[in-house]
Amino acid sequence: MSSVFDEYEQLLAAQTRPNGAHGGGEKGSTLKVDVPVFTLNSDDPEDRWSFVVFCLRIAVSEDANKPLRQGALISLLCSHSQVMRNHVALAGKQNEATLAVLEIDGFANGTPQFNNRSGVSEERAQRFAMIAGSLPRACSNGTPFVTAGAEDDAPEDITDTLERILSIQAQVWVTVAKAMTAYETADESETRRINKYMQQGRVQKKYILYPVCRSTIQLTIRQSLAVRIFLVSELKRGRNTAGGTSTYYNLVGDVDSYIRNTGLTAFFLTLKYGINTKTSALALSSLSGDIQKMKQLMRLYRMKGDNAPYMTLLGDSDQMSFAPAEYAQLYSFAMGMASVLDKGTGKYQFAKDFMSTSFWRLGVEYAQAQGSSINEDMAAELKLTPAARRGLAAAAQRVSEVTSSIDMPTQQVGVLTGLSEGGSQALQGGSNRSQGQPEAGDGETQFLDLMRAVANSMREAPNSAQGTPQSGPPPTPGPSQDNDTDWGY
């Protein structure tokens, strides 16, 4: 019978093979779009700033068509480069579009002066200037910037110009993070990240764009695979560039942490809390199929190479193989573990229609049971004595008991806590009154009491690590739809 299992494993491997691995697929058979991309032949600070404003205006213009917006956006992201033509050539390495490079020698009264090699007539140059002047109505001051007169302020030198360029590019990169996932709810996270870069000095407040401009840029990114291919190539270069050597690629590398593995959260959370915890529940026969599936998915992720973290941004069809419905039971167990071990998952909407509430409850129980358990490998490496192990287990048990009665200011209402706003406030108030704890605002006193309890437990080192049982598990999310308790022992 072993041959049957071998054949089954090979079948799973064949089903999870990345698309296009055999070669001979369609390459360039669809119609190619001509995307005009602008480059500047001058290093003059004022000309470079005029070029950036020109590209930004076209990228958000209401009169510009899609290819023109896409080309202007690529030009905007290349505007920091010493030789822009070489940088633009990176974007041309694709089968989705053909880039037509239009060289600009300078600007005269806001009108670009094209090089003769570009073959752009004076009439067409005037048309580009008219398109650049058609901004969204929400830009009330007639510029893409919230601060009026920001674009008319001439830069002092090339350093000032680069700071302005990076301020705009940072806002463009921030929009990439949720361009392909939850773009309709991206305003809050974009504002938070822009504020972060302002505090770091990477974005100047004077050159903050209108939200409608960022939304238009984000829509262009969603609609254009050519732009997204260029963005991924820049993200790869940012990861391969040594830290501290390039201001621009330091920024790209920082933004990369928000973009990598977007859309794969369920897969990596399942690996972290379902596989990496190495609980005895993995021996259940009912989880063997999901574990085998995860094994094949990990192999598929490695086969994707450098493009694996950017499957969502590229619109890769292989991303659907990583959906949690493919390993629903193991996913349910992992989310039960995460709901107890990691309160940071509170903002992740893990409750799905296909979730098994039985396996979710099993994960909760295992996570609570592991709260005071000891990692034997780490204990052996630290050379802990039996008395120290018992003391550590007792301290962990004591902490779990103390924290259950303390009003934690970070507790949030949500599916993980099972509390409504009124219920959580009543619970916190009742706990303070019954236990005689300080008021909610006195968090320092509560923290000191907690640390004293831990220190006392470590000094006592009791002979037995057993304590009172922990409080009950958190409520099961969603209605109870399965009463099957056969775990396949």
Swiss-Prot record:
> Per the record, which residues fall in region Ntail?
403-489
Pfam families the record matches: Paramyxo_ncap
- Subcellular localization, per the record? Virion; Host cytoplasm
**Which residues does the record give as RNA binding sites?**
178, 193, 258, 348, 352
Query: Which GO terms of the molecular function aspect are on file?
Result: RNA binding; structural molecule activity
Region (P protein-binding), start-end ranges: 1-375
Check the UniProt entry and state the signal peptide residues, or none.
none
**GO cellular component assignments:** helical viral capsid; host cell cytoplasm; ribonucleoprotein complex; viral nucleocapsid
Task: Give the Polar residues compositional bias ranges.
Answer: 422-437
What keywords does the record list, in alphabetical order? Capsid protein, Helical capsid protein, Host cytoplasm, Ribonucleoprotein, RNA-binding, Viral nucleoprotein, Virion
**Record region (Ncore):** 1-402
Domain remark in the UniProt entry: Ncore is globular and carries the regions required for self-assembly and RNA-binding. Ntail is an intrinsically disordered monomeric domain in the C-terminus.
Functionally, this protein is described as follows: Forms the helical nucleocapsid (NC) in a ratio of 1 N per 6 ribonucleotides, protecting the genome from nucleases. The encapsidated genomic RNA serves as template for transcription and replication; encapsidation by N is coupled to RNA synthesis. Forms the encapsidation complex with the phosphoprotein protein P. Before encapsidation, the newly synthesized free N protein, so-called N0, is chaperoned by P.
* Protein name (Swiss-Prot/TrEMBL): Nucleoprotein
The record lists the organism as Newcastle disease virus (strain Chicken/United States/B1/48)
